Amino acid sequence: MKKQLIIGTRSSPLALWQAEFTKAELSRHFPDLEITLKLVKTTGDVLLDSPLSKIGDMGLFTKDIEKFLIAKEIDLAVHSLKDVPTATPEGLIISAFTEREDTRDVIISKTGAKLLDLPKNAKVATSSLRRMSQLKSLRPDFEICDIRGNLNTRFKKFDEGEFDAMMLAYAGVYRLNFSDRISEILPHEIMLPAVGQGALGIETRVDDEQTREIVKVMNHSTTEYCCKAERALLRHLQGGCQIPIGAYASFKNGTLHLLAFVGSTDGTIGIRDEITKTGLTSPSQAEEAGIELAKELLKQGAEKILSEIRKSC
């Protein structure tokens, strides 16, 4: 058994929370293990002037950390799973999916108003095409404004800016103790989350069997089934672009239920569908369900939506 572990992480407050959480959990199970953090500045932390959709790189918040992992300068990387591309670099693997926090998105508004009660032509801040698409389908009058930076920076920009509301993931807001700022938690019926939202992905080298065995203690089986279904769906739909896709899977007693959404960036077209599979006994079966739903979405018109978006990539 290893005596030391180095965790690679971004340096944002939320990333540090995630890394410290991982460190604490591993220390609880392996009290004699010496665990340290290595902070890595990623491309996504540096390129803050452009919307994420315009940058186009799928590994903005992960690939720089993965370089350290491949070079054996760290033993594992802790990521927000929603930031992790569905294809990991050769030699790397997601070895643990941590128990998921609430997957829903939230609205933070200046007046405390809920989403549908915001004034006409309200300015809503988000950097996500997924949120933009679903917001515009609900309220075509909204003016969507790009907002970048870590969570603390976004709250500062929001408080100082001319926004009426801002949309964020509940998980990050809760973990950094901003829950008192929430105006509304949005149900999945109107806002499907990002693939993997609320879960952490712990990435290791494939050939590092000791570290893989250590981090297994953090793997949450239900989350693994759900996130593998969602990621398989995204992988089958994606073509290397930032695209408006939402998904949410639940898994209980061998039954997987998966909801998914693909929409145009302007919100004028949106396709939602779902699938239920019973008797599942392995995560690979959950992945098959994700691929099956992706194929159904493509048949229903998602291919046309995605091909239009890819033209501008």
From Swiss-Prot:
Parts forming coiled coils: none
Highest taxon above the source species: Bacteria
Pfam family name, one: Porphobil_deamC
Reaction catalyzed: 4 porphobilinogen + H2O = hydroxymethylbilane + 4 NH4(+)
Keywords, sorted A to Z: Chlorophyll biosynthesis, Porphyrin biosynthesis, Transferase
Position of the signal peptide: none
Sites bearing S-(dipyrrolylmethanemethyl)cysteine, chain numbering: C241
CDD domains the record matches: PBP2_EcHMBS_like
Cofactor(s) in the UniProt record: dipyrromethane
Annotated pathway: Porphyrin-containing compound metabolism; protoporphyrin-IX biosynthesis; coproporphyrinogen-III from 5-aminolevulinate: step 2/4; Porphyrin-containing compound metabolism; chlorophyll biosynthesis
Function: Tetrapolymerization of the monopyrrole PBG into the hydroxymethylbilane pre-uroporphyrinogen in several discrete steps.
Family, per entry: Belongs to the HMBS family.
Subunit structure: Monomer.
Other remarks on this protein: The porphobilinogen subunits are added to the dipyrromethane group.
Name used for this protein in its record: Porphobilinogen deaminase
Organism: Chlorobium luteolum (strain DSM 273 / BCRC 81028 / 2530) (Pelodictyon luteolum)
Lineage: Bacteria, Pseudomonadati, Chlorobiota, Chlorobiia, Chlorobiales
